[in-house]
Amino acid sequence: MATPSLISETEAWKDLKAHLEGIKRTHLRELMGDTERCQSMMVEFDNIFLDYSRQQASPDTINKLYKLAEAAHLKQKIDRMYNGDHINSTENRSVLHVALRAPRNSAICSDGKNVVPDVWNVLDKIKDFSERVRNGSWVGATGKELKDVIAVGIGGSFLGPLFVHTALQTDPEASKNARGRELRFLANVDPIDAARNISGLNPETTLVVVVSKTFTTAETMLNARTLREWISSALGVSAVAKHMVAVSTNLPLVEKFGIDPNNAFAFWDWVGGRYSVCSAVGVLPLSLQYGFAVVEKFLQGAHSIDQHFSSAPFEKNIPVLLGLLSVWNVSFLGYPARAILPYSQALEKLAPHIQQVSMESNGKGVSIDGLPLPFESGEIDFGEPGTNGQHSFYQLIHQGRVIPCDFIGVVKSQQPVYLKGEVVNNHDELMSNFFAQPDALAYGKTPEQLKKENVSEHLIPHKTFTGNRPSLSILLPTLDAYRIGQLLAIYEHRVAVQGFVWGINSFDQWGVELGKSLATQVRKQLHASRVKGEPVEEGFNFSTKTLLTRYLEATSDVPADPSTLLPKI
């Protein structure tokens, strides 16, 4: 008998569907009363503690999810990824971001070639270059040290490095290394973003890192040309070679742009943009800011999870457990979203990065074989650090829609504060909420409890909390470069597990192409209208034509062939 093409056709999927009704009838108050169950839903690896006992699941549910993983050939798919098979079938590519953080003596192959030596050649080049910039042996065109870095990229070339940078800013070791230096990220083609990035900076002390694999990404290259003009108008055209470097594989276009090809840092087709933070995309700007030694610890942390993911049995495998639980929440319980709630301000950019990793990877409507999916896949990811989120969207999470939550806590703060006379210190206050919120979601508050508290009858419906809202808790011992790398890799592999089980390609992103191609048509129309005065006519529907015409009429003062104008703030 042939293997079913869709995971939903397997007996394991059908068994979970049959199991679903019993779980729906069981409140988390009851499930949490079973100590043995709770103990079985706690896993530890390298002092990272995962508690998923507040999921709407019994031990039987978890066992059935293991059966689903087996039916999806999850272990074989993980092995195929590590072996360099072309699991990104629509682009015929390997998926080897694990190679980016592999030790120097490792062997990870793509198309029969060990790619690890290539990775380390680039890492060694980054180490050498970043150290020369940091120690002042590489200087700008006027002889001044380059203390400020603007990394120009978009999507995965921006969100991942920004997450790591923000997390490292308050780490004692990293912040000490970064003293007197500044790292900024320019992503949006909106000129306001360029204005904010160059505000207060001196071109003489600024180094620009342009990140584009092909060196043709429209938004990135327009921003790069804007910064090139900013530098050359102040220092002369020849200064570009000293003040701009590239992360790219297209050396001819790098050279044509004015950047010395020797100052281009490579990455490869087997690295997807949203998985590229451990490549030169992230390692170069982060090393310039914090020093290569700190960034190497980040890579080592990610590698430790890579090893755990590839070797740990499923019942002890943190990314596998997280991925299977997400499949359960989305495709069976019908919860379309997930809140990522780190109780650490240093992780404020985690949710935006994972939003891209998850939604661009798993926002697919067809299987890897091109069959329409008869079930929901992918989830809407969002989040905010605690306790900020509690005063923002937690109202909906507690009394509105059911949204599974990831609570992420850190045992030791990067920046402890102790005030004499306070009942608890600042970090204890933060963590009090970290421990309380999952229970509030799970247990809720019943009308009977409110009556015992003598709450007015008319307020009881408003103060009732239904509870039975799933969450999980991840407790990290610290938040240094190593742990940040671990957290990144946990979420990367979790997303892969979901895609492997759903049977989709988590490593392409055709959904971003249509809007880009339509924007090309609009761009041509804007140019024709500005330069030749042509009206908006053919090729647009009435709505778009109306909006475009209003825009052009309101910006008729924009010159057709303007002289260069740079931001002024």
Swiss-Prot record:
GO terms for cellular component: cytosol. GO terms for biological process: gluconeogenesis; glucose 6-phosphate metabolic process; glycolytic process. Coiled coil: none annotated. Pathway: Carbohydrate degradation; glycolysis; D-glyceraldehyde 3-phosphate and glycerone phosphate from D-glucose: step 2/4. Its EC number is 5.3.1.9. It comes from Clarkia xantiana (Gunsight clarkia). The gene is PGIC2. Homodimer. Keywords: Cytoplasm, Gluconeogenesis, Glycolysis, Isomerase. Its main location: cytoplasm. Gene3D superfamilies: 1.10.1390.10, Glucose-6-phosphate isomerase like protein, domain 1. It is an enzyme of class 5 (isomerase). This is Glucose-6-phosphate isomerase, cytosolic 2. Pfam families: PGI (PF00342). Belongs to the GPI family. It comes from the Eukaryota. InterPro entries: G6P_Isomerase (IPR001672), G6P_Isomerase_C (IPR023096), Phosphoglucose_isomerase_CS (IPR018189), SIS_dom_sf (IPR046348), SIS_PGI_1 (IPR035476), SIS_PGI_2 (IPR035482). Signal peptide: none annotated. It catalyses: alpha-D-glucose 6-phosphate = beta-D-fructose 6-phosphate. CDD domains: SIS_PGI_1, SIS_PGI_2.
